Amino acid sequence: MSDFLRQFARQFAQLDKNSLQRLGELYTEDVHFTDPLHEVQGIGQLRSYFTELYANVTELRFDFHGFDPTGEGQGYLRWVMSYRHPRLSGGQLIRVDGCSYLLWRDKVYRHRDYFDAGALLYEHLPVLGRAIAWLKRRMG
């Protein structure tokens, strides 16, 4: 089972803005993809989502470090996403820990990502980021 997860992670990590046509090798036509900020249904919407994602960043990389099968055709991938956006954190590299829950037969038909949306985006916005940092200091 973890062979599927390792192979999926390897292929996913090789994706970039010029290879999104390969999403069809990883996902079914009716894939359901969800993360804390988006929900898309179908390979066409998924391709559009990733096209927009890659268009808005200058660098994007996934480093997978955990491959955890939980049953037949299901499991978790643990990863660190690293990206640069010209308008966030002065274009500095931002790293976000996360995990993906996958359901598959021959290909993935359900993909659910879990990550801290604040660490991904909100904490790096000029005004909102300062407010979040202040709140974290007060609560910590």
Predicted regions and their residues:
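A solvent-exposed, acidic/Ser-Thr-rich amphipathic alpha-helical stretch
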Residues: 20-24, 28-73
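A beta-strand edge to alpha-helix "cap/lid" segment located at domain peripheries
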Residues: 55-61, 69-140
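Basic/polar N-terminal segments that are highly enriched at the extreme N-terminus
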Residues: 1-3, 139-140
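Soluble or luminal CAZymes and related metallo-dependent hydrolases
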Residues: 3-7, 45, 94
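A short alpha-helix capping/helix-coil boundary motif
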Residues: 1, 29, 77-78
